[in-house]
From Swiss-Prot:
GO terms under biological process: base-excision repair
Pfam families: Pur_DNA_glyco
The protein, known as: Putative 3-methyladenine DNA glycosylase
Database matches in InterPro entries: Formyl_transferase-like_C_sf (IPR011034), MPG (IPR003180), MPG_sf (IPR036995)
Amino acid sequence: MRRSKTAAPWPGTIVPRAFFNRMATEVAPQLLNKILAAADGRAGRIVEVEAYAGALDPAAHTYRGKTPRNATMFGAPGHFYVYFTYGMHWCCNCVCGPDGAGTGVLIRALEPLHGLEQMRAARPPRTRDRDLCRGPARLTQAMGIGGAQDGVDLVGAREGFAIVDDGMAPPADLAGGPRIGIRVGQDLPWRWSVPGNRYVSGAAPRI
């Protein structure tokens, strides 16, 4: 499949829809080192992710089926699924698998690359640069992602955001381990991060 060049101010090509049209557990580790880029110039390298496997995963929002809240997750791959949590935070996922699968990848942390002034302005005063995007709620705030971005197409680059491949491969020595902040499915090793990266949100996962 031919890749179109991204309109975002970061060199590389937009990741095609076929990349996302696979199991979330396959997509998640391969998202590491890709770029989440916004049309306004903000961009960060993806350094931590978690996979959620729909009906096979008791921790997934889609485990018990489709609802108005999680409907986007059952849509076509390569879109944002953005949800509100704890009554105060937004989190963003990339929808994966075929239409109707209800699976996706939570982006947990970014290494800020571009548009840091905008990120700082979007976060609380005196936030350290290391903490701008270190955690799923922090990164959505820093990148300007909220409920209005639920369902945004990440492939077309016409709706403000894209996942960009700038040529940096996923790490060969992947760290994998339990996901964070869930009450069920803790035994599933579906969290991956870039080893040694200081922007990872928690302790490095272990296999």
